[in-house]
Regions:
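Sequence-level preference for short, compositionally simple segments enriched
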Residues: 1-134
Length: 134
């Protein structure tokens, strides 16, 4: 059976917020690094990651989302999945966070977003070097 062609439509901010509510992910990634000189001392590398995953048949949609945000990239994960990914701090801080502050998430995912924003504020602050995960 042939797949029906879906007409390309303008991506509206409210639609995109709802889409991310269901399909998006806000991650805070930490990696511990032990000091070779003092094994009892650890440092942490922390970065933020925003991602939307879809079936590979929706690659065009993911590329339109990347165009909408004017940042990030689309990458095929495997034969069946494609990701819109973004982890550049400046783009997260200047594009993604303000977007979801203007067009708030409606599901429990808003709690993930609020933690994401808090982590961004810590990373941006001068005390980021002293931050330890709880």
């Amino acid at each position: 059976m042939a797949r029906l062609e879906v007409p390309e439509r303008e991506i509206l901010p409210e639609w995109l917020t709802g889409f991310v509510d269901g399909e998006g992910n806000f991650s805070i990634v930490t990696v511990e690094k032990k000091s070779s000189d003092a094994p009892s001392i650890s440092s942490y590398k922390v970065w933020l990651h925003f991602q939307i995953t879809q079936h590979s048949r929706d690659t065009d949609l993911m590329e339109r989302i990347a165009t909408f945000f004017e940042c990030g990239g689309v990458k095929k994960r495997n034969i069946d999945a494609v990701d819109f990914k973004l982890n550049k701090f400046e783009e997260l801080e200047n594009i993604i966070i303000p977007f979801f502050q203007k067009y708030p998430l409606q599901s429990a995912k808003v709690l993930d977003f609020l933690a994401f924003v808090e982590a961004a504020n810590v990373i941006k602050s001068k005390t980021a070097r002293q931050w330890t995960p709880e």
